[in-house]
Amino acid sequence: MLGGGSVDGERDTDDDAAGAVAAPPAIDFPAEVSDPKYDESDVPAELQVFKEPLQQPTFPFLVANQLLLVSLLEHLSHVHEPNPLHSKQVFKLLCQTFIKMGLLSSFTCSDEFSSLRLHHNRAITHLMRSAKERVRQDPCQDNSYMQKIRSREIALEAQTSRYLNEFEELAILGKGGYGRVYKVRNKLDGQHYAIKKILIKSATKTDCMKVLREVKVLAGLQHPNIVGYHTAWIEHVHVLQPQDRVPIQLPSLEVLSEHEGDRNQGGVKDNESSSSIIFAELTPEKENPLAESDVKNENNNLVSYRANLVIRSSSESESSIELQEDGLNESPLRPVVKHQLPLGHSSDVEGNFTSTDESSEDNLNLLGQTEARYHLMLHIQMQLCELSLWDWIAERNNRSRECVDEAACPYVMASVATKIFQELVEGVFYIHNMGIVHRDLKPRNIFLHGPDQQVKIGDFGLACADIIQKSADWTNRNGKGTPTHTSRVGTCLYASPEQLEGSEYDAKSDMYSLGVILLELFQPFGTEMERATVLTGVRTGRIPESLSKRCPVQAKYIQLLTGRNAAQRPSALQLLQSELFQTTGNVNLTLQMKIMEQEKEIEELKKQLSLLSQDKGLKR
């Protein structure tokens, strides 16, 4: 008892509280209550059929159910009030009433879900028409009616999908921990973009709001060295389980299968780990991440790393948000589920199976028994950058073998590498200044855009990465689902020691990754084995002697950035103010680049003038 209050005082307080009229509690996500057990000793033997209490099915999609209820209210508002302005006001009043009654959560009535409500309203209208047709028909019919309804539902989803209506899917660019990135063409402006699709499964109210909030944070990242963000939206996708597959062949499926076939040949980059950002103010007390990393260092010294992001504990609900690699169910027109495999089977996503929740396994079993599911798909439209720093380094390494004189080979020139690294540090300084830690900086997540090869940091995930599980991480294949307080994320060769060890990390973890990238920029490698050996040796302070002699300043900062003590690593601001970028050679390099750009502009202007003079001569 706090405050030294008496028992009588507490009783009086309780009586006063009971007499007051309290608002009904919000029925957001009711906690499951175990079934009561009764004494069945006197029950006849023939009636003792069920020895165990019946397991009531769980409902992990309460958010989707509330969204459907809100859509019904909006639909009724439009039916009873033809005036659009008045119907909107009626809808808001109805929502406020239902919120006060505790039947709805306020966030489901927000504008962020307007596109989903439009999807629902169209589906409701279609179903009402179908029901009317059914009533007017002969009730004694075969089952072809339900098949007809199912095909109409799928066609309706295609009509209400913004992604299918506005974009043409051209190719798959790669995949990360939260979804796949596709190269698309906008049907209206004809421009090419990159769209990342993230499948949201079993979303709770709190986690949905986190996703929406953090998408807005990503939209606020405006910097020349950050991949441009255009827009984001949420759609419903209809996922059919394998036992209810619909034999529909679509062009988009064929295109996807071709690219997936090319992936094994190196045509599609398969990200080694999930890329994500976190807010710098997050502390271990607020996080409960779980990850299991498998580092294999075989005879060829090739190191592969698999990192799994896990759930941050939520006080409001046991269920959590799961962002899954979408596979073939990224659009409403793709009924065949590829990644929803039975427990114990592996998908094409590398990684150990983990679980932080005993109830998650039950949810999976329920998913396996369900005929159809409706999920939310988050689409993030970004600037298209097809050339990554990984590609540039690979090409540089190939050309360095052919170049005898380093000064004559622009792909190995230290000045070019310095320019790339400086722009990279400027981008990292910007995101750190915004309070964001990337956690997975590596050449595959860094892009070179345009003719001047401007550096763009990309492949940002969501700041709620610690409450997210990948599809392959739902359940541990070894049956070990005990959560641990570790946070091993990032790719092994570029991840800091504190990340791999699961201890606390901050922006200095990104600085370690920059140190490894700095070494790779200034040290060409002849083979993959040599690269893996050198980058692994950096962890123990070993830097190639040839690099130390050729680039002593860079070697010095590589040593500082890759030190085990994170506090002693220089920050991004300290790097920008260091001798790395303040030498006379770098100033001359910048001036030379500007002169070259001006010369190109002069040549282009001369060509345009000559064309104009020719046109005038023809007219005369």
Swiss-Prot record:
Position of motif SIFI-degron?
85-104
Q: Which GO terms describe its molecular function?
A: ATP binding; eukaryotic translation initiation factor 2alpha kinase activity; heme binding; protein homodimerization activity; protein kinase activity; protein serine kinase activity
Which GO CC terms are listed, alphabetically? cytoplasm; cytosol; nucleus
Q: Which residues cross the membrane?
A: none
Q: Name one Pfam family in it.
A: Pkinase
Q: Which reaction does it catalyse?
A: L-seryl-[protein] + ATP = O-phospho-L-seryl-[protein] + ADP + H(+); L-threonyl-[protein] + ATP = O-phospho-L-threonyl-[protein] + ADP + H(+)
Coiled coil residues, start to end: none
Name the chain's protein: Eukaryotic translation initiation factor 2-alpha kinase 1
GN (gene name)? Eif2ak1
